[in-house]
Amino acid sequence: MELQEVLRMNGGEGDTSYAKNSAYNHLVLNKVKPVLEQCIRELLRASLPNINKCIKVADLGCASGPNTLLTVRDIVQSIDKVGQEKKNELERPTIQIFLNDLFQNDFNSVFKLLPSFYRKLEKENGRKIGSCLIGAMPGSFYSRLFPEESMHFLHSCYCLHWLSQVPSGLVTELGISTNKGSIYSSKASRLPVQKAYLDQFTKDFTTFLRIHSEELFSHGRMLLTCICKGVEFDALNAIDLLEMAINDLVVEGHLEEEKLDSFNLPVYIPSAEEVKCIVEEEGSFEILYLETFKVLYDAGFSIDDNYPVRSHVQVYSDEHIKAEYVASSVRAVYEPILASHFGEAIIPDIFHRFAKHAAKVLPLGKAYYNNLIISLAKKPEKSDM
């Protein structure tokens, strides 16, 4: 099976769907919103071609479910807020938003939400239907998606840790895994494995920057949010817990060791410095803003997180119940690729053990994601200077 066929979230609206298990991502988007507003404010001051009539925006790696339109709402509200600050100096522009993800993404679940979304925009923002146009642009964001110099703003959240392929060199000429017992570039991985993953990320992220810089107008903006490495050695990434759960099944005799050793996630979690260096080395963008922040795995399920818990989501204090929620969130993201390699039957067992490990680390305060927000502006061509 081709990798792109399984690089997707769980679709639909069932109990294991991404739509029902993305409260954490909702919180991250809320934390990014002030930076998004500032980015839009700077964009509208830049006097890009045709921006006063039609702002062209893309959300790269949009996934599915309500969070997709939460991002769209935040972008629209930010544009309208800046317009109000200008006291109607400019007419309210049309906004054209392209939702991008791989071809297997559940775009239909998003499209079904659009009629009510448009009505809500009209009621809350005064945007008449037709003044915000939303469509899909399926394809890999590591390839060209839009014509040259046609876009004003590109946004991506929690996507860039996904690589275009599993790095080469993880199996010797004799067919022996060089990453035994691991499923990605973890702290326990050997240095050659860590280098192979970093090299693949560098290649992919450089391609991402180069291709999308060509699609943006000069001075166009890009806002990226991604998982990043922290400085704390004892912090556990969710993929570490997933790795531990799969190893448990091997030890218990439910899974062959060779099956584990032949599996490597096309995922790399970079450091903030690695991201910064690649941007500077590629050279198409100026870094306007860079910040890191932490969010606990169980964020979205506690009043202390300052998260607007939805009415049908009960707030629990028991760590085992929280751990089940964390396991469901991770399952919604990784189940398709895990099932393609290990089989669907063993998925419940993997995440049952994942939840057990999560319940142990949640009380320690070491179960969190480090996150990076980076705001970029495309440098002008020499002919534009």
Curated annotation (Swiss-Prot):
Protein name in UniProt: Xanthosine methyltransferase 2
Enzyme class per UniProt: transferase
Domain of life: Eukaryota
Key words, A-Z: Magnesium, Metal-binding, Methyltransferase, S-adenosyl-L-methionine, Transferase
InterPro entries in UniProt: MeTrfase_7, MeTrfase_capping, SAM-dependent_MTases_sf
GO biological process entries: methylation
Reaction catalyzed: xanthosine + S-adenosyl-L-methionine = 7-methylxanthosine + S-adenosyl-L-homocysteine
Cofactor: Mg(2+)
Function as written in the Swiss-Prot or TrEMBL entry: Involved in the biosynthesis of caffeine. Specific for xanthosine and could not use xanthosine 5'-monophosphate (XMP) as substrate. Catalyzes the 7-N-methylation activity of xanthosine, but does not have 1-N- or 3-N-methylation activity.
EC number: 2.1.1.158
Free-text cofactor note: Binds 1 Mg(2+) ion per subunit.
An annotated Gene Ontology molecular function: metal ion binding
Pfam family of the protein (one): Methyltransf_7
Amino acids binding xanthosine: N21, N25, Y158, H161, W162, S329, Y334, Y369
Binding site for Mg(2+): N179, D261, F263, N264
Gene3D superfamilies named among the record's database cross-references: Methyltransferase, alpha-helical capping domain, Vaccinia Virus protein VP39
Lineage of the species this protein comes from: Eukaryota, Viridiplantae, Streptophyta, Embryophyta, Tracheophyta
Residues the UniProt record annotates as site (Involved in substrate discrimination): H155, V267, E344
